[in-house]
């Protein structure tokens, strides 16, 4: 990683350079997330395009006679390929994504392409029961902007409460406690805030004013710390 400083000392043309992480066939040998970010910043600091590898669950061929995946990040080894791509996008240090193993099937190639080329990173939400039509529209049909004056308890997108002001959002699934990763829409009993989309960061009591409509998948719950204030993201509805 120190070689990049020596290379840059010669004033190379940046459009002839690409920084690329390694892939790691052996389980438990991939980069940790913090080290990955630190190494990537060396390239970013010089304005060098940077690439990393994901692994295709459908593929089993690599450079060595082992089939334990070929990711750059150890935390990506057992993720779905779409979640791996969104993970790399959320780090904001990677320009290009490569599939390390062969031969990925059509489904994995399509999932990786959709994740890479979609306008914003997306997190998947499991809905135990169907949300109302308006709640589904709020949560899944539009991009969300993480409000900049951020709370320790909630990620807030306040724009839906403006767009859908005055529309009915009756109470349902609004009791007990909310857990990290729960996705809620503020209901009509909280008039000023009705329609606001929120993702729970810390456990808190539900006082009846927030309708729980789903929960982040286990895979994507681990990506929650990478969401930053003032960033735009999307939510995707999935079933169990």
For each predicted feature, which ranges?
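Catalytic alpha/beta core domains of metabolic enzymes, predominantly
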Residues: 2-129
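C-terminal functional modules
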Residues: 128-240
């Amino acid at each position: 990683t120190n070689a990049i400083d020596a290379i840059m000392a010669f004033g190379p043309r940046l459009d002839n350079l690409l920084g690329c992480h390694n892939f790691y066939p052996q389980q438990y040998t991939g980069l940790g997330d913090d080290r990955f970010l630190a190494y990537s910043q060396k390239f970013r600091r010089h304005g060098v395009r940077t690439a990393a590898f994901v692994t295709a669950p459908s593929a089993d061929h690599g450079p060595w006679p082992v089939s334990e995946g070929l990711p750059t990040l150890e935390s990506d080894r057992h993720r779905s390929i779409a979640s791996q791509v969104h993970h790399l996008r959320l780090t904001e240090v990677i320009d290009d994504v490569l599939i390390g193993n062969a031969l990925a099937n059509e489904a994995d190639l399509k999932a990786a392409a959709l994740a890479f080329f979609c306008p914003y990173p997306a997190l998947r939400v499991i809905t135990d029961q169907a949300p109302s039509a308006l709640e589904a529209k709020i949560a899944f049909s539009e991009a969300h902007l993480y409000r900049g004056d951020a709370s320790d308890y909630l990620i807030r997108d306040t724009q839906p409460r403006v767009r859908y002001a005055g529309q009915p959002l009756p109470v349902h699934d609004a009791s007990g406690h909310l857990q990290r990763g729960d996705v809620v829409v503020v209901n009509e009993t909280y008039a000023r805030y009705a329609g606001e989309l929120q993702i729970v960061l810390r456990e808190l009591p539900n006082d009846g004013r927030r309708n729980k409509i789903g929960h982040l998948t286990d895979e994507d719950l681990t990506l929650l710390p990478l969401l930053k204030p003032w960033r735009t993201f999307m939510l995707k509805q999935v079933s169990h």
